Regions:
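Active-site beta->alpha loop and helix N-cap motifs at the rims of alpha/beta catalytic domains
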Residues: 14, 23-144, 160-165
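Extreme N-terminal cap/leader segments of soluble proteins
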Residues: 1-2, 22
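Catalytic alpha/beta core domains of metabolic enzymes, predominantly
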Residues: 159-187
Length: 187
């Protein structure tokens, strides 16, 4: 997966704004920050520089967040995660897409609360797969718990591209019937 350096991001941001077709842009998170570090860049300076043109244009920015692992590949203490949301919001990030590859709500719900405390929009994520146990009911019950915890948005994250259109459509209908004000995004 290609991830650009901060100098490339800063050059492309004004062009994205000029296109005039985006309400949201992913600006940082796990992979972005790891690439910054690999290039010897400061990810905190990078996110401030990259989000600035979007903030000025009124375009919301969002980051990817691995729940219990925050932006890393290993668990991060709760106090560090709580602080991370405050820092990211101060740096210009509006939305955090919180996911756990196992859909374990215990790994996602604390991050929803921390993001809300920091003034961010927590977009709780359902990682989609296809198997006999991964039914509409399975995913809808997880969505219910995440929404009850405060998530105003749900993302259906089909990382492997194996989500079945019929099942995904029914899942969206099921969530919207129970939670009509919740925004649902497919990724």
């Amino acid at each position: 997966k290609y991830q650009p350096r901060v100098d490339q991001l800063v050059r492309i941001a004004p062009l994205i704004v000029e296109m005039g077709c985006f309400a949201r842009v992913e600006t940082n998170g796990g992979a972005f920050e790891q690439v910054n570090l690999l290039y010897g860049e400061n990810p905190n300076k990078a996110v401030r520089a990259f989000t600035a043109p979007f903030r000025e244009a009124g375009i919301q920015t969002h980051m990817l967040d691995r729940g219990l692992n925050a932006l890393r590949m290993y668990p991060v203490p709760a106090d560090v995660r709580r602080l991370m949301y405050k820092v990211k919001h101060a740096q210009g990030v509006d939305i955090t897409r919180i996911f756990c590859g196992l859909n374990e709500t215990r790994n996602i719900i604390p991050s929803i609360k921390y993001a809300l405390e920091a003034g961010m929009i927590p977009q709780a994520t359902l990682c989609i797969t296809y198997s006999p146990v991964h039914t509409v009911e399975y995913y809808a019950s997880i969505a219910d718990r995440l929404i009850e915890a405060g998530a105003p948005e749900i993302c259906l994250k089909d990382m492997a591209g194996i989500g079945r259109p019929g099942m995904l459509g029914q899942l969206v209908r099921t969530i919207k019937e129970k939670h009509p004000d919740v925004l649902i995004q497919y990724h």
